[in-house]
UniProtKB/Swiss-Prot annotation:
Its main location: cytoplasm. One of its GO terms (biological process) is cytoplasmic translational initiation. The lineage of its organism: Eukaryota, Metazoa, Cnidaria, Anthozoa, Hexacorallia. This is Eukaryotic translation initiation factor 3 subunit I. It comes from the Eukaryota. Belongs to the eIF-3 subunit I family. It comes from Nematostella vectensis (Starlet sea anemone).
Length: 321
């Protein structure tokens, strides 16, 4: 399995995301310029220039016409996906940590950091009215939001928090519907399964966990021996890929083995590790499965995005149960 190593960023990757068709791969890093690539051959199509700080979060809408990015420059930008021009800009009072398009593509969700005397807030904007003011503002009092996404049919939001809490929010009233505390440390990433019935979380407490979307019931746990930064569910097999590693400031040697920077594959049902993929020279910060399930990508602290296409033998891995 020889990966494509994409080097278009000067600093660490913060998030990567495929579009719905899987032909494009979007990446964000701390170097202010989100980038779009052809996922088939790794060719760089272009960059989205305009941010004045690290870009923490990105998302692309259903038909790949619009793209959003939020960053440490206290703003979220809505871009024309093809032309790379800014269509709209939302100014916030603190850094934008998470963002996402609704499935309908008409609303945008974002969350801001608790910093500089500002409290953490979840904001929802309507793309159709120039996004001048939010249609819903949800103050988050306890612990700041570190990961978030839309629930099925845009009925609610699911957010992961710095203290390990997982919450569900009603998008009409802004009320908190459910709150569970299954993680003991910060939730770094939440990714939905293709049919939105379940999602996987990645946490600093060295575990990734599977949850039911509607009830937030904890289903499975995937244990590692390092902080988990990202986890993604395969759309065609019962596999979950988990990535992380010791934080950069805690790594005292430069060996890729000592820091444990490989991506690990687990069986979704049995919670057993079934394989590892090495490669990154530093922790893995973001993972994404291709929508066809035949490849996956990882973005690391080393500034590289790596596209891994599975060998034909991957299809032969079967568990009888």
């Amino acid at each position: 399995m020889k990966p494509l190593a994409l080097h278009g960023h000067e600093r660490n990757i913060t998030q990567i995301k495929y579009n719905r068709m899987g032909d494009l791969l979007f990446s964000a890093a701390k170097d202010t310029r989100p980038t779009v690539w052809y996922s088939l051959n790794g060719e760089r199509l272009g960059t989205y220039n305009g941010h004045g700080g690290a870009v923490w979060c990105i998302d692309v809408n259903y038909d790949t016409t619009q793209f959003i990015s939020g960053g440490a420059d206290n703003c979220l930008r809505l871009w024309d996906c093809e032309k790379g021009v800014t269509l709209s800009k939302i100014e916030t009072k603190s850094a934008v940590r998470t963002c996402g398009f609704s499935y309908g593509g008409n609303e945008i969700m974002l969350s801001t950091d608790r910093q500089m005397g500002q409290s953490c807030r979840i904001l929802i904007f309507d793309v159709r009215d120039n996004m001048e003011s939010p249609i819903l503002t949800i103050p988050v009092d306890n612990s700041k939001v570190t990961a978030g996404l839309w629930g099925p049919l845009d009925q609610f939001l699911v957010t992961g928090h710095e203290n390990g809490e997982l919450c569900q929010w009603d998008v009409k009233s802004g009320n908190k519907l459910i709150s569970v505390q299954e993680h003991s440390k910060q939730i770094n990433d939440i990714q939905m399964y293709k049919d939105s019935t379940m999602f996987v979380t990645a946490s600093k407490d060295t575990t990734a966990k599977l949850f039911d979307t509607d009830s937030l019931r904890h289903l499975k746990t995937y244990k590692t021996d390092r902080p988990v930064n990202s986890a993604a569910l395969s759309p065609i097999k019962d596999h979950v890929v988990v990535g992380g590693g010791q934080e950069a400031m805690e790594v005292t040697t430069t060996s890729t083995r000592v820091g444990k920077f490989d991506a690990r594959f687990f069986h979704v049902v049995f919670e057993e590790e079934i394989g590892r993929v090495k490669g990154h020279f530093g922790p893995i910060n973001s993972l994404a499965f291709h929508p066809d399930g035949r490849s996956y990508s990882s973005g690391g602290e080393d500034g590289y995005v790596r596209i891994h296409s599975f060998d034909p033998s991957y299809d032969d891995i079967e568990f009888e149960y």
